[in-house]
Amino acid sequence: GARAFFDWVVVVGVALLVAILVRTFLLAHFIVEGESMNSTLSPGDRVFVNKMSYHLHDPGRGDVVVLHEITGVTERDLIKRIIGLPGDEIQMDNCVVRINGQVLLEPYLDPTVVTPGRCGQGITPTVIPEDRVFVMGDNRPGSHDSRALGTIPFDDLVGRAFVVFWPKSDWQWL
């Protein structure tokens, strides 16, 4: 009777509390909009984001991240790849990214999308400040990234995307 109902309410309440805590502090999902991460991610892909990642360790080169952008009165979340880390000197000419003078190997780029002369705006030599990263989309000609936004503060990183979970045909670890 009443005891069973009370037990049921407690179980549901605890489950909701746990779900809210996980969503708020640990894990989020993100729906990819636009084509800036083609061909790694496609519009409509859904990814899980570890929101604790950068509370436990610093961002890493190559990490796929969700970042929070505020431009004037507009707020939105973007998904990009970390290319440059604090203290790095980054530059890009004719689609070739150099970090501290060394060519950055980027096996995740689709050579049919990023081709010499077709990679959007270049990057003049820039040193990345402390507690900031330089992000770019894998679809270089079609990405709104640090080339336009500037370097991104660590505090604007929502977390590290680590898996595409939907649609099933696109399932992959990032």
Residue ranges and their predicted role:
Residues G1-F5, V9, L21, F25-I31, ...:
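Soluble "head" domains of membrane/secretory-pathway proteins
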